[in-house]
Amino acid sequence: MIIAITGGIGAGKTTAITAIKQMGYLVISADDIYSELLKDPEFVQGVYRAVDIDCDKVELDRNLVSTAVFKNSEKLKALNDFTHAKIYNAMFEKSKNHEVVFHEVPLLFESGYQARYDKVIVIMRDINSRIQSVKSRSGLSTDEIVSRIKNQFDYENLDKNKHTVITNNGNLSDFSAKVKAVVNEILG
């Protein structure tokens, strides 16, 4: 069984993943996979090709790519299509031979891969708590955080009957206990 963990910035995915790891389950992070892929020159060249950049660098020039996709929705879509496919394929490959695996996937609904999962757990949190959480770890301003939240999937309008939702509005230990209870319920 492969279970996705997702939620917006500052919702509490990291805390949820920590609780799941404490239970002894394998967790594969999309962000970690992306970092691994960036070490592969073929992947980096694929990123450049996806956004029509003629470049022979073997390391990703984030500014170059950002400039190429800025205000160009077609190139941004091409970039996301390429990177998301590679990330998901690597995650599912690493999941082979494991009975239960959790995938931490920040952009699950944006990428449209939710149907590939046996179960999806969505972490929800009120916006003010999300802003404070991100502020405390990033140094971003409130406006920058709100802008990022607005650019993410609108979890408030998610069909909550299709997915398991865990609300993170208590303290850390209560939330961790809630996550563990939900995981135990899902896995029977």
Q: Predicted regions span which residues?
A:
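Walker A/P-loop
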Residues: 14
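ATP-dependent small-molecule kinase phosphotransfer cores
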Residues: 32, 36-99
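ATP-binding Walker
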Residues: 11
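Hydrophobic anchor at the beta1->P-loop junction of P-loop NTPases
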Residues: 3-5
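ATP-dependent NMP and nucleoside kinases share a basic, alpha-helical "lid"
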Residues: 90-95, 100-137
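Small-molecule kinase domains that catalyze NTP-dependent phosphoryl transfer to phosphate-bearing small molecules
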Residues: 90-91, 115-116, 136-186
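P-loop (Walker A) phosphate-binding loop of NTP-binding proteins
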Residues: 8, 20
